[in-house]
Amino acid sequence: MNNDKHKLYMLRILKDVFNDPELSQILAFKGDASLMFFYQLPRFSVDLDFNLLDITQKEMAYQKLREIALKYGRIADEQLKHNDPLVVLDYEKGEQNLKLKLSTRFFDNHYELKNLAGTNIPVMVEPDMFAHKLCALLDRDGMTGHDVFDIHFFLSKQAPIHAGIVEQRMKKLFANYLDDCIAALQTVSTKELMQNVGEFIEGKLKQEMKSGKLIDRTIEMLEERKIVPFITEYPRNRMPIEDVTITHSPEGKNILLAQIAGKSFMEKEISTKEFSIFQALPKDEDRKNFLVHLARENYFDEWQKQSDRNTPSLKR
């Protein structure tokens, strides 16, 4: 594979995607390639991963990605009906195919605009990226070398992590999940990990991966994170949300109800678009996550005022 050529095609497709007035509003860039382009990940990535921010636009986004891919070659494979649409571009015979993947899952992600070759791109922030990468370590059918390598990368640069995403995805406390990761890494085969990452890393890091030193150091740094976790705090994530539901008023409006810290919060009307997204999410877990997101968006200011009133002030 010609890495420079592959990276150039990825760059051109990214520019096409985020210069499109519709796609730029509903897609965000994430995954290994975003780490390579924006966070100096020292290994090569071959696919483009996007989060679909509005699932009601899934078919439109898929068709537009397909049209963009066809500018550069033929479609080697594709799928729309699956929860996560996929377009596989074959841009040249004998070269690595380029996958364009859409994720429809909903988590409490955060994004920031970054510029790439004159194009503004919403990119998942580093703490959230680290969290999803740590989840992927044990969330796949089998542990992969690139996940281990990337986790070592985040730990080595002392990157903060959004622990809330880990707990949301893995359904356990962050510290307990770290123990699971450590236990799994202590038994993994270095030879097996090298099979799917060896060609994408080089030099000293490749030798450390092959010898097992990189895995040992990753375990050591995960142990350190149990003591010094470097957790990124988002103010809205501090809301102790106990229950969120959507009901309908006699006038047909969509009404949000929430129970936060033992108190019922006032009804808030949500938009037709928000209700459509809620209905379109395919999994119960995603709908629950979206309701929590709506509660944080709609009740944060009110909850914060109540919290401030209930917090005793220090007397001078």
Model-derived features: positions:
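Glycine-rich beta-strand-to-loop/alpha-helix junction loops that act as flexible
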Residues: 29-34
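Mixed-charge, Lys/Arg-enriched low-complexity segments
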Residues: 277-315
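General alpha-helical segment detector with a strong preference for membrane-spanning helices
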Residues: 36, 50-51
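Acidic, low-complexity, intrinsically disordered interaction modules
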Residues: 249-283
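Short glycine-biased active-site loop of nucleotidyltransferases that positions the nucleotide triphosphate
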Residues: 36-44
